[in-house]
Amino acid sequence: MSESSASALQLGRPSRQPAVHPENLSLDASCFSSPPVNFLQELPSYRSIARRRTTVHSRDKQSGTLLKSTDSYSSQLEDRIAENLSSQSLRNYALNISEKRRLRDIQETQMKYLSEWDQWKRYSSKSWKRFLEKAREMTTHLELWREDIRSIEGKFGTGIQSYFSFLRFLVLLNLVIFLIIFMLVLLPILLTKYKITNSSFVLIPFKDTDIQCTVYPVSSSGLIYFYSYIIDLLSGTGFLEETSLFYGHYTIDGVKFQNFTYDLPLAYLISTIAYLALSLLWIVKRSVEGFKINLIRSEEHFQSYCNKIFAGWDFCITNRSMADLKHSSLRYELRADLEEERIRQKIAERTSEETIRIYSLRLFLNCIVLAVLGACFYAIYVATVFSQEHMKKEIDKMVFGENLLILYLPSIVITLANFITPMIFAKIIRYEDYSPGFEIRLTILRCVFMRLATICVLVFTLGSKITSCDDDTCDLCGYNQKLYPCWETQVGQEMYKLMIFDFIIILAVTLFVDFPRKLLVTYCSSWKLIQCWGQQEFAIPDNVLGIVYGQTICWIGAFFSPLLPAIATLKFIIIFYVKEWSLLYTCRPSPRPFRASNSNFFFLLVLLIGLCLAIIPLTISISRIPSSKACGPFTNFNTTWEVIPKTVSTFPSSLQSFIHGVTSEAFAVPFFMIICLIMFYFIALAGAHKRVVIQLREQLSLESRDKRYLIQKLTEAQRDTRN
């Protein structure tokens, strides 16, 4: 053998020493050999690292770590894995069967030398984890609409599937909100009303209240036409106004049980705070989970392709139909990735003239969007003022159609604005040249600003009418008692009308627009007008905004109408089946697919915006606007929030001092500073973690280059050997 061949073989020998993670290492020490230092310095990874090091000493130190004895490394690996066997299963390690058996033998050997107490702890820990795994598997089978959502994912992709998963989350959220209100407010009243327990009502005494402020006109009696019941059912007036559906029904101070008195005003306020806090925590928790997934998947696009192609298939699938669904789902995800890659390449290839042109066009189109929003807000304001001024004056003189039109005028204008503006925004955004994912997010932002701002305009208009009047009733009662004797109930009626009318519009559009359009496209496809119209696409931004809009109404209205979450739950359940039927039979898949990882996080972010906007009018209503003196549980308080100081005054003096100290400015300012410091710490920690992730990604890239270099050297050595 020539000297060059021997040298080449020596160079080829280190091919068995690539940079491998510990979990991929073989435990056989004979598989390792100590390569020369000079050869390691020829690796691309070493050269890249050497350029970054400032001293030779650090490089030598790093080289020394690479030259550790493989025997000691192998034994350290065995010890480390054996120590972790108590907390993790062997199946979690990327080892072959023989090595897993070897580790299992090590585990059994270690168990013999443990005390009975340690053996029992390890055995109970394993049993508990096995039980949790089985319970987790069982709960996945109990998920609401699990099979329906998986079928939608396979046929239409993960983007549309994320909408239905989001709808399922809102169903569960509203159900929990209703249970909170039911347990804290409705259940004590029902137990007393139907004599289930030995309890009685404590009626509210009207103290220091002017008699004029306590007047609450009763609904007209006598001959009532049949259509009046329909109006009452659709608007929440008449017979529904006096039921437990609205705030004005709860005119009791408490429920007296055998040993204590249940404070209903306090429970009513606590239920409101509880459902808002629960909604906030639940949404933030799900948003953080979605943000983690979004952050991981958005780092490296090539890695996403590799994961889907080489590791995307679920080999546990044995059913033919489920295999087809999984195949379709992977195809849609790959199409979404390729479409986004095409948009990125197109953006990268733009010239400076094209960039200036597209940004100028976007600026002009955004001015049009702002003009449309301003016109809608003004129309809602005018409609609300007109409806409130004519509702009490002339409603008894009107016929059925005029009566219903006056009652529903704000809801009609809001619904028309919500129906027209998304179509305008969808037409506008086509000329702005964004990626499919960003198109959806920007359209949702515009529509959410439109839809949620319309609710804010309505509530602001109602608030201005409630707190302003021409006579002396505002000075006497604190609000416009003549027009709004029980203003909380009337705000609840407006929220009720918005929810009912929104539900009617969703059903009407599906049954009388989407379904006939499908029939025309199917049986009259030769007509040019029908060809231009085309088959309906499932518009995710519009549908998401629809349910976020409905949920925001529910959050605002639950204080004024305690049963509104139950109505919202039934509404969303029906919407799920209606939208599923519409998707399967009247819609076609979108020609521009998009990924769901971004959508899930963004849907929750939009929902969080809706929750924040709902908290603002509720906070003002509870803390600023005087409570009605003619109805509701807070007639003895100037504002709803006054029930909290009254309750605190009944506590022991030491507890009162503690609460006053915690809520004082002397505590709030240092607490806020500490929170800011903690937040800055976590921001810095997140930045450090991100830098580590970048370094690890670079290390993975360098390892692949090392492997290519070693394969090249091995090929050269084999060629020299043959020669």
Curated annotation (Swiss-Prot):
Subunit-level organization:
Interacts with PIEZO2; the interaction inhibits PIEZO2-conducted mechanically activated currents.
Q: Name one Pfam family in it.
A: TMC
Which UniProt keywords are present, listed alphabetically? Glycoprotein, Membrane, Phosphoprotein, Transmembrane, Transmembrane helix
The record describes the protein's role as: Acts as an inhibitory modulator of PIEZO2 mechanosensitive channel in dorsal root ganglion (DRG) neurons through physical interactions or interference with the interaction between Piezo2 and the cytoskeleton.
- Name of the gene: TMC7
The residue spans the entry assigns to the Cytoplasmic side of the membrane are as follows 190-219, 285-362, 426-494, 577-601, 687-723
Database matches in PANTHER family: TRANSMEMBRANE CHANNEL-LIKE PROTEIN 7 (PTHR23302:SF42), TRANSMEMBRANE CHANNEL-RELATED (PTHR23302)
Organism of this sequence: Macaca fascicularis
Q: Which GO terms describe its molecular function?
A: ion channel inhibitor activity; mechanosensitive monoatomic ion channel activity
What does the record list as GO biological process?
sensory perception of mechanical stimulus
| Protein family according to the UniProt entry | Belongs to the TMC family.
InterPro entries reported for this sequence: TMC, TMC_dom
Topological type in the membrane: Multi-pass membrane protein
A GO cellular component annotation here is: plasma membrane
Q: What is the lineage of its organism?
A: Eukaryota, Metazoa, Chordata, Craniata, Vertebrata
Q: Where is this region: Disordered?
A: 1-21, 51-70
User: Which positions bear Phosphoserine?
Assistant: 89
Q: Which residues are glycosylated?
A: 24, 84, 96, 259, 638
Task: List residues in topological domain: Extracellular.
Answer: 1-168, 241-263, 384-404, 516-555, 623-665
Say where the protein is mainly found. Answer: membrane
Spans traversing the lipid bilayer: 169-189, 220-240, 264-284, 363-383, 405-425, 495-515, 556-576, 602-622, 666-686
This one is known as: Transmembrane channel-like protein 7
Report the subcellular localization.
Membrane
